[in-house]
Regions:
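Short, polar/charged alpha-helical segment
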Residues: 1-6, 119-121
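Ligand-binding "clamshell"
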Residues: 41-55, 152, 166-204
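Pocket-flanking alpha-helical
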Residues: 14-50, 144-148, 164-169
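C-terminal functional modules
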Residues: 223-224, 233-291
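Short helix-initiation/N-cap motifs at beta->coil->alpha
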Residues: 6-22, 132-143
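A bilobed periplasmic-binding-protein/Venus flytrap-type ligand-binding module shared by bacterial periplasmic
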Residues: 64-74, 212-228, 251-252
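Ligand-binding pocket segment of bilobal, Venus flytrap-like solute-binding proteins
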Residues: 28-32, 105-189
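A conserved helix-loop-strand patch within extracytoplasmic ligand-binding domains
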Residues: 51-106
Length: 291
Protein backbone atom coordinates (compact mmCIF):
# COMPACT_ATOMS: atom_id res chain seq x y z
CA UNK A 1 0.00 0.00 0.00
CA UNK A 2 2.84 2.38 0.87
CA UNK A 3 5.01 1.73 -2.18
CA UNK A 4 2.23 0.96 -4.67
CA UNK A 5 -0.40 3.50 -3.71
CA UNK A 6 1.78 6.20 -2.14
CA UNK A 7 0.11 6.10 1.28
CA UNK A 8 1.79 6.38 4.64
CA UNK A 9 1.07 3.14 6.52
CA UNK A 10 1.29 2.38 10.22
CA UNK A 11 1.06 -1.33 11.06
CA UNK A 12 -0.35 -2.23 14.47
CA UNK A 13 -0.28 -5.63 16.17
CA UNK A 14 -2.55 -6.71 19.00
CA UNK A 15 -4.87 -9.33 20.43
CA UNK A 16 -8.42 -9.76 19.16
CA UNK A 17 -10.44 -7.85 21.76
CA UNK A 18 -8.61 -4.48 21.78
CA UNK A 19 -7.92 -4.53 18.03
CA UNK A 20 -11.56 -5.18 17.13
CA UNK A 21 -12.72 -2.54 19.62
CA UNK A 22 -10.40 -0.01 17.97
CA UNK A 23 -11.84 -0.87 14.55
CA UNK A 24 -15.41 -0.41 15.78
CA UNK A 25 -14.37 2.98 17.25
CA UNK A 26 -12.85 4.03 13.88
CA UNK A 27 -9.36 4.25 15.44
CA UNK A 28 -8.01 1.59 13.04
CA UNK A 29 -8.68 1.66 9.31
CA UNK A 30 -8.25 -1.98 8.25
CA UNK A 31 -7.89 -5.38 9.93
CA UNK A 32 -6.63 -8.16 7.67
CA UNK A 33 -7.15 -11.14 10.00
CA UNK A 34 -10.59 -11.37 11.56
CA UNK A 35 -11.49 -14.69 13.22
CA UNK A 36 -15.08 -14.09 12.16
CA UNK A 37 -16.56 -17.42 13.25
CA UNK A 38 -15.43 -16.70 16.82
CA UNK A 39 -17.07 -13.26 16.71
CA UNK A 40 -20.17 -13.75 14.55
CA UNK A 41 -22.66 -11.77 16.66
CA UNK A 42 -20.21 -8.95 17.36
CA UNK A 43 -19.33 -8.60 13.67
CA UNK A 44 -22.94 -8.73 12.50
CA UNK A 45 -24.02 -6.21 15.15
CA UNK A 46 -21.36 -3.74 13.99
CA UNK A 47 -22.15 -4.27 10.31
CA UNK A 48 -25.79 -3.50 11.16
CA UNK A 49 -24.72 -0.38 13.10
CA UNK A 50 -22.69 0.76 10.11
CA UNK A 51 -19.36 0.93 11.96
CA UNK A 52 -17.51 -1.59 9.76
CA UNK A 53 -17.47 -2.94 6.22
CA UNK A 54 -16.50 -6.57 5.53
CA UNK A 55 -13.96 -7.06 2.72
CA UNK A 56 -14.00 -10.80 2.04
CA UNK A 57 -11.71 -13.70 2.87
CA UNK A 58 -8.00 -13.36 3.68
CA UNK A 59 -7.13 -17.00 4.41
CA UNK A 60 -9.74 -19.49 3.18
CA UNK A 61 -9.00 -22.34 5.57
CA UNK A 62 -8.21 -22.15 9.27
CA UNK A 63 -8.42 -25.56 10.91
CA UNK A 64 -8.06 -27.06 14.39
CA UNK A 65 -7.85 -30.69 15.30
CA UNK A 66 -5.77 -33.73 16.23
CA UNK A 67 -2.56 -34.24 14.27
CA UNK A 68 0.01 -37.01 13.87
CA UNK A 69 3.45 -36.62 12.29
CA UNK A 70 3.36 -37.78 8.67
CA UNK A 71 6.04 -40.51 8.91
CA UNK A 72 4.12 -42.26 11.71
CA UNK A 73 0.74 -41.69 10.05
CA UNK A 74 2.02 -43.18 6.78
CA UNK A 75 3.77 -46.14 8.42
CA UNK A 76 0.74 -47.22 10.48
CA UNK A 77 -2.08 -46.00 8.23
CA UNK A 78 -3.36 -43.43 10.73
CA UNK A 79 -6.07 -41.40 9.01
CA UNK A 80 -8.98 -41.23 11.47
CA UNK A 81 -9.21 -40.78 15.25
CA UNK A 82 -10.52 -44.36 15.41
CA UNK A 83 -7.19 -45.58 14.00
CA UNK A 84 -5.51 -44.36 17.20
CA UNK A 85 -7.52 -46.71 19.43
CA UNK A 86 -5.19 -49.61 20.08
CA UNK A 87 -2.53 -50.37 22.67
CA UNK A 88 -0.01 -50.96 19.88
CA UNK A 89 -0.50 -47.44 18.50
CA UNK A 90 -0.74 -45.82 21.95
CA UNK A 91 2.70 -47.24 22.85
CA UNK A 92 4.23 -45.19 20.03
CA UNK A 93 3.23 -42.04 21.92
CA UNK A 94 3.99 -43.31 25.45
CA UNK A 95 3.29 -40.84 28.25
CA UNK A 96 6.22 -41.04 30.74
CA UNK A 97 3.91 -39.75 33.49
CA UNK A 98 1.11 -42.27 32.85
CA UNK A 99 2.46 -45.82 32.43
CA UNK A 100 0.43 -47.88 29.99
CA UNK A 101 -1.02 -44.88 28.21
CA UNK A 102 -0.03 -42.75 25.25
CA UNK A 103 0.09 -38.95 25.38
CA UNK A 104 -1.82 -36.53 23.23
CA UNK A 105 -0.44 -33.05 23.78
CA UNK A 106 -3.54 -30.89 24.03
CA UNK A 107 -4.53 -27.27 24.47
CA UNK A 108 -3.56 -25.28 27.53
CA UNK A 109 -6.03 -25.89 30.36
CA UNK A 110 -7.05 -22.22 30.43
CA UNK A 111 -8.20 -22.39 26.81
CA UNK A 112 -11.69 -23.70 25.98
CA UNK A 113 -10.19 -26.09 23.44
CA UNK A 114 -8.59 -28.04 26.31
CA UNK A 115 -12.03 -28.93 27.66
CA UNK A 116 -13.37 -29.54 24.15
CA UNK A 117 -10.53 -32.01 23.60
CA UNK A 118 -11.22 -33.61 26.99
CA UNK A 119 -14.84 -34.23 25.97
CA UNK A 120 -13.81 -35.46 22.52
CA UNK A 121 -11.39 -37.93 24.10
CA UNK A 122 -14.24 -39.45 26.11
CA UNK A 123 -16.75 -39.48 23.24
CA UNK A 124 -14.27 -40.99 20.77
CA UNK A 125 -12.96 -43.52 23.29
CA UNK A 126 -9.43 -42.11 23.16
CA UNK A 127 -9.32 -41.66 26.93
CA UNK A 128 -8.87 -45.43 27.32
CA UNK A 129 -5.53 -45.18 25.52
CA UNK A 130 -4.26 -41.58 25.90
CA UNK A 131 -3.92 -38.74 28.36
CA UNK A 132 -5.18 -35.29 27.33
CA UNK A 133 -1.88 -33.65 28.31
CA UNK A 134 -1.79 -29.96 29.25
CA UNK A 135 1.51 -28.53 27.89
CA UNK A 136 1.24 -25.47 30.16
CA UNK A 137 1.78 -22.79 27.51
CA UNK A 138 1.54 -22.13 23.79
CA UNK A 139 5.33 -22.12 23.59
CA UNK A 140 5.53 -25.51 25.30
CA UNK A 141 2.95 -26.92 22.86
CA UNK A 142 5.06 -25.73 19.92
CA UNK A 143 8.22 -27.07 21.58
CA UNK A 144 6.65 -30.50 22.13
CA UNK A 145 5.80 -30.79 18.44
CA UNK A 146 9.05 -29.30 17.11
CA UNK A 147 11.08 -31.37 19.59
CA UNK A 148 9.41 -34.58 18.48
CA UNK A 149 10.31 -33.88 14.86
CA UNK A 150 13.87 -32.93 15.77
CA UNK A 151 14.35 -36.21 17.66
CA UNK A 152 12.49 -38.29 15.07
CA UNK A 153 9.88 -39.32 17.64
CA UNK A 154 6.16 -39.85 16.93
CA UNK A 155 3.96 -36.79 17.57
CA UNK A 156 0.26 -36.86 18.52
CA UNK A 157 -1.03 -33.39 19.28
CA UNK A 158 -3.80 -30.86 19.05
CA UNK A 159 -2.88 -27.96 16.78
CA UNK A 160 -4.27 -25.42 14.33
CA UNK A 161 -3.52 -23.49 11.14
CA UNK A 162 -2.34 -21.06 9.95
CA UNK A 163 0.79 -20.92 12.11
CA UNK A 164 4.52 -20.60 11.57
CA UNK A 165 5.13 -24.07 13.00
CA UNK A 166 2.88 -25.61 10.33
CA UNK A 167 5.20 -24.13 7.74
CA UNK A 168 8.10 -26.15 9.19
CA UNK A 169 6.71 -29.56 10.18
CA UNK A 170 4.70 -32.18 8.31
CA UNK A 171 1.60 -33.08 10.31
CA UNK A 172 -1.42 -35.09 9.14
CA UNK A 173 -4.84 -34.02 10.44
CA UNK A 174 -6.86 -36.99 11.67
CA UNK A 175 -10.42 -37.27 10.41
CA UNK A 176 -13.26 -36.94 12.91
CA UNK A 177 -17.05 -37.06 12.49
CA UNK A 178 -17.97 -34.21 10.14
CA UNK A 179 -18.85 -30.86 11.68
CA UNK A 180 -22.52 -30.61 12.59
CA UNK A 181 -23.91 -27.49 14.26
CA UNK A 182 -26.51 -29.32 16.37
CA UNK A 183 -23.89 -31.80 17.60
CA UNK A 184 -21.45 -28.99 18.34
CA UNK A 185 -24.09 -27.09 20.32
CA UNK A 186 -24.88 -30.20 22.39
CA UNK A 187 -21.19 -30.81 23.08
CA UNK A 188 -20.67 -27.14 24.00
CA UNK A 189 -23.23 -27.41 26.81
CA UNK A 190 -21.21 -30.27 28.34
CA UNK A 191 -17.96 -28.34 27.83
CA UNK A 192 -19.32 -25.23 29.58
CA UNK A 193 -20.66 -27.35 32.47
CA UNK A 194 -17.22 -28.93 32.95
CA UNK A 195 -15.51 -25.52 32.81
CA UNK A 196 -17.83 -24.28 35.56
CA UNK A 197 -18.04 -27.38 37.76
CA UNK A 198 -15.10 -29.67 36.95
CA UNK A 199 -14.66 -32.87 34.91
CA UNK A 200 -16.80 -35.02 37.22
CA UNK A 201 -19.99 -33.49 35.74
CA UNK A 202 -19.23 -34.98 32.30
CA UNK A 203 -22.32 -36.38 30.56
CA UNK A 204 -22.51 -38.51 27.43
CA UNK A 205 -22.78 -36.34 24.35
CA UNK A 206 -21.93 -36.36 20.68
CA UNK A 207 -18.74 -34.83 19.27
CA UNK A 208 -17.49 -33.72 15.87
CA UNK A 209 -14.62 -31.92 14.20
CA UNK A 210 -13.91 -28.23 14.74
CA UNK A 211 -15.52 -25.99 12.13
CA UNK A 212 -13.21 -25.01 9.27
CA UNK A 213 -12.99 -21.24 9.56
CA UNK A 214 -12.16 -18.61 6.99
CA UNK A 215 -10.16 -15.64 8.26
CA UNK A 216 -11.66 -12.44 6.90
CA UNK A 217 -10.87 -8.75 6.40
CA UNK A 218 -12.73 -5.64 7.50
CA UNK A 219 -12.41 -1.86 7.35
CA UNK A 220 -13.84 0.96 9.41
CA UNK A 221 -16.75 2.66 7.68
CA UNK A 222 -14.96 5.99 8.10
CA UNK A 223 -12.05 4.73 5.97
CA UNK A 224 -14.07 2.68 3.47
CA UNK A 225 -16.59 5.44 2.76
CA UNK A 226 -13.89 7.96 1.79
CA UNK A 227 -13.82 7.96 -2.03
CA UNK A 228 -10.07 8.65 -2.02
CA UNK A 229 -9.50 5.25 -0.39
CA UNK A 230 -11.42 3.23 -3.02
CA UNK A 231 -8.27 1.89 -4.80
CA UNK A 232 -6.96 0.54 -1.48
CA UNK A 233 -10.33 -0.99 -0.55
CA UNK A 234 -10.49 -2.63 -3.99
CA UNK A 235 -7.04 -4.16 -3.43
CA UNK A 236 -7.91 -5.43 0.06
CA UNK A 237 -11.09 -7.03 -1.32
CA UNK A 238 -9.16 -8.82 -4.08
CA UNK A 239 -6.38 -10.44 -2.13
CA UNK A 240 -6.68 -13.90 -0.59
CA UNK A 241 -3.70 -16.07 0.41
CA UNK A 242 -3.80 -19.90 0.61
CA UNK A 243 -3.21 -21.25 4.12
CA UNK A 244 -0.05 -23.13 3.08
CA UNK A 245 1.51 -19.85 1.90
CA UNK A 246 0.53 -18.12 5.14
CA UNK A 247 2.20 -20.93 7.10
CA UNK A 248 5.40 -20.50 5.04
CA UNK A 249 5.43 -16.74 5.56
CA UNK A 250 4.86 -17.13 9.30
CA UNK A 251 7.74 -19.62 9.46
CA UNK A 252 9.97 -17.14 7.59
CA UNK A 253 8.86 -14.35 9.94
CA UNK A 254 9.69 -16.39 13.05
CA UNK A 255 12.88 -18.14 11.98
CA UNK A 256 14.57 -16.21 9.20
CA UNK A 257 13.56 -12.56 9.48
CA UNK A 258 13.99 -12.26 13.24
CA UNK A 259 10.41 -11.03 13.55
CA UNK A 260 10.78 -8.36 10.86
CA UNK A 261 7.39 -7.73 9.18
CA UNK A 262 8.83 -5.70 6.30
CA UNK A 263 11.47 -8.33 5.46
CA UNK A 264 8.75 -11.01 5.54
CA UNK A 265 6.53 -8.97 3.22
CA UNK A 266 9.40 -8.43 0.78
CA UNK A 267 10.19 -12.15 0.82
CA UNK A 268 6.56 -12.99 -0.01
CA UNK A 269 6.35 -10.40 -2.79
CA UNK A 270 9.69 -11.50 -4.29
CA UNK A 271 8.94 -15.22 -4.24
CA UNK A 272 5.29 -15.14 -5.38
CA UNK A 273 3.50 -13.70 -8.39
CA UNK A 274 -0.08 -14.28 -7.17
CA UNK A 275 -0.25 -10.78 -5.74
CA UNK A 276 0.18 -9.15 -9.15
CA UNK A 277 -3.42 -10.04 -10.05
CA UNK A 278 -4.68 -8.12 -7.01
CA UNK A 279 -3.44 -4.70 -8.17
CA UNK A 280 -3.30 -2.63 -11.39
CA UNK A 281 -0.14 -3.08 -13.47
CA UNK A 282 1.22 0.38 -12.60
CA UNK A 283 0.92 -0.41 -8.89
CA UNK A 284 2.64 -3.79 -9.40
CA UNK A 285 5.52 -2.05 -11.20
CA UNK A 286 6.02 0.38 -8.33
CA UNK A 287 6.01 -2.44 -5.77
CA UNK A 288 8.52 -4.50 -7.78
CA UNK A 289 10.80 -1.48 -8.10
CA UNK A 290 10.84 -1.10 -4.31
CA UNK A 291 11.90 -4.69 -3.57
Amino acid sequence: IEKGYGCKVEATKGSTTPIMAALFDQQIDIITEVWRDNLVQLIEDNVAKGTIVELGVNTPSSTQGFYVDKPTADKYGLKHVDDMKSEKIAKLFADPEAPGKGRMTSCISGWTCYTINLVKHKVYGLDKYYTNFDPGSGGALDAAIAGGFKKGKPVFSYYWTPTGLMGKVDLVKLEEPKYDQACWDEMTKVVEDIKANGPDVYKDTCACEYVNMSLTKAASTKFASNAANKPIIDFIKKYSIPTADVNKSLAFYMDESGGDMEATAKNFLSSNSMWESWVPSDVASKVKASL
